[in-house]
């Protein structure tokens, strides 16, 4: 049986914060031997202090394989700490060890090829059968084509569910932790085989102001027509509706929710920035390629809608684990959520705790999130992604 425990602490000295957090995680895990530790360390700790963080965990939990990344904030099921001096630790052990973590240096230069190499390694570690398994990656987002990297993994292991997040960091950038060191331009992957019943749930922080509409003409990243009409006319019509009046003054905060005709279910879209195209003032430019046949809805960050969507996601996750209760969770939480969305920290962890009780959960403020949408693993923004397993 797999056992888990979490702990968190805040201290300006990384070694001290990590030692306290690891001790709390170890105590929460009980008497079982801990074989793995996932560490999220506040980005206020510089490179030297990250080494101290990792030494603190290794000294407190000797023999454990330690992985993780930097973050501007961390969370557990009990709290969300928007403080760059915080450290959170998830301790895992028992008689059901996880597969060894996967690690890659140099992910920027050819992101798709680097992703494909990681995907092949994951598939080999699963003896060629990725069905029902989940790969959670933590990656330095600096100068990275994240979409290409994830696509490379999917090319090599099409049955593998991919989740995870981009690390977040301070002025010196983000770091990924492996083998007692902190690396830029790197990725660590944690494999959760089907035997652990891993599931991934995603919740949107941006809720639709409109219903999904079909893109009927597009070129590159330009939306030329929506249901046969000018996208600008569609947008102006949406903003003129009584419930949306006043939003015209904050159109810079509106985002496009891009989905597919076949998209079904709650929040099955990806959120992307958009702007009026410079070359064609009747078209919209979106921050990724689009094609005719996809759908678009205009969205806005919405605390009330985000809370309701979070509750719906948690209900879905609970139902998925009716027959196999989860033993731990990892929550990848966009840095644009928390107090930036709700006005105060801690709401998402509180909702997780209400739904799952004292389930050990650890999480980070991430630069982007990865979760399935529209039939494939996608890069997300303003989302919360919850991985449950065990």
Predicted regions: what they are:
Residues 1-58, 63-342, 346-359, 364-390:
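Small-residue-enriched flexible segments
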């Amino acid at each position: 049986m797999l056992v888990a425990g979490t702990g968190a602490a805040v201290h300006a000295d990384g070694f001290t914060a990590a030692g306290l957090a690891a001790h709390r995680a170890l105590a929460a895990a009980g008497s079982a031997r801990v074989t793995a530790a996932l560490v999220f360390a506040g980005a206020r700790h510089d490179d030297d202090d990250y080494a101290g963080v990792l030494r603190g965990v290794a000294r407190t939990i000797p023999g454990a394989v330690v992985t993780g990344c930097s973050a501007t904030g961390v969370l557990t099921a009990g709290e969300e700490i928007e403080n760059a001096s915080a450290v959170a630790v998830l301790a895992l052990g028992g008689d059901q060890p996880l597969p060894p973590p996967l690690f890659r240096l140099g992910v920027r230069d050819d992101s798709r090829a680097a992703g494909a190499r990681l995907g092949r390694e994951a598939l080999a570690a699963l003896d060629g059968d990725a069905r029902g398994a989940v790969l959670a990656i933590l990656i330095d987002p600096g100068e990275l084509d994240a979409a290409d990297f994830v696509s490379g993994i999917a090319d090599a292991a099409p049955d593998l569910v991919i989740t995870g997040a981009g690390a977040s960091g301070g002025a010196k950038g983000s770091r990924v932790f492996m083998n007692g060191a902190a690396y830029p331009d790197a990725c660590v992957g944690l494999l959760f085989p089907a035997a652990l019943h891993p599931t991934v749930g995603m919740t949107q922080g941006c809720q639709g102001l409109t219903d999904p509409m079909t893109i009927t003409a597009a070129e590159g990243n330009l939306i030329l027509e929506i249901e046969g009409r000018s996208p600008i006319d569609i947008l102006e019509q949406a903003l003129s509706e009584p419930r949306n009046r006043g939003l015209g003054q904050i159109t810079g905060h509106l985002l496009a929710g891009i989905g597919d005709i076949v998209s079904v279910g709650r929040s099955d879209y990806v959120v992307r920035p958009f702007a009026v195209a410079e070359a064609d003032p009747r078209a919209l430019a979106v921050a990724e390629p689009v094609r005719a046949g996809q759908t678009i809805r205009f969205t806005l960050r919405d605390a009330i809608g985000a809370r309701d969507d979070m509750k719906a996601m948690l209900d879905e996750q609970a139902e998925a684990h009716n027959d196999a209760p989860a033993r731990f969770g990892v929550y990848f939480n966009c840095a644009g959520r928390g107090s930036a969305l709700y006005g105060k920290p801690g709401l998402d962890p509180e909702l997780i705790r209400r739904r799952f009780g004292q389930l050990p959960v650890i999480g980070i403020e991430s630069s982007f999130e990865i979760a399935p949408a529209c039939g494939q693993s996608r890069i997300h923004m303003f989302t919360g992604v919850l991985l449950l397993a065990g």
